[in-house]
Amino acid sequence: DTFSSRGLGDVYKRQPGTGKKPNFWASGISVVMHMKNPNVPAMHFNTRYIFTSHGWFGGGMDVTPCLKDKNLEKWFHSELKKACNKHNKNYYSKYKKWCDRYFYLPHRNEPRGIGGIFFDYKKENWEKDFAFVREVGLCFKNIFREIILKKSKKKWTTKEKEIQYLKRGR
């Protein structure tokens, strides 16, 4: 496939490894969840591998609660840090900052949610990079499962549901 054949015009010129040829191959997993229960936060997860004349990994995850929960925020970031630290002690800090910048909403002067991690153009060592991306996926699965088990059966009020509608609808 090519970027231009996908209706992306000259976007390929900004992509590493395209040079004069807009050919690419891409594979990814993207999960976006907005639950009925306002106690369960919206969650986003994405991993990808893109190949032009060379390949790289990217991805991340973030959580956007409608209702404040400092315990969830602390636990979520602790789990992310543990997963990142298995591969590089600098990853969590680096990728959290990237996520904070990437998902900042300047028109609202606020972050999208409680943050997470975001990374792109990982191409140092294919085996190590793939192992990290796999770890991010497993971390998301475990975080999502734990949140669902803890919060999905929790009752909510009409006011909490209205907060959810407002948060999602703006």
Predicted regions located by residue number:
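Aromatic- and glycine-enriched beta-alpha-beta binding-site module
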Residues: K13-E73
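A broad, low-specificity signal for short, low-complexity segments enriched in glycine/proline
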Residues: D10, G19-F24, R134-C139
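A short linear-motif detector with a strong N-terminal bias
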Residues: F3, N23-S27, P41, Y95-W98, ...
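C-terminal, helix-dominated tail/subdomain
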Residues: E162-R170
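Single conserved hydrophobic/aromatic residue that forms the stacking wall/gate
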Residues: D1-Y12
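Long, contiguous internal "core" modules enriched in hydrophobic/ aromatic residues
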Residues: G55-T157, E162
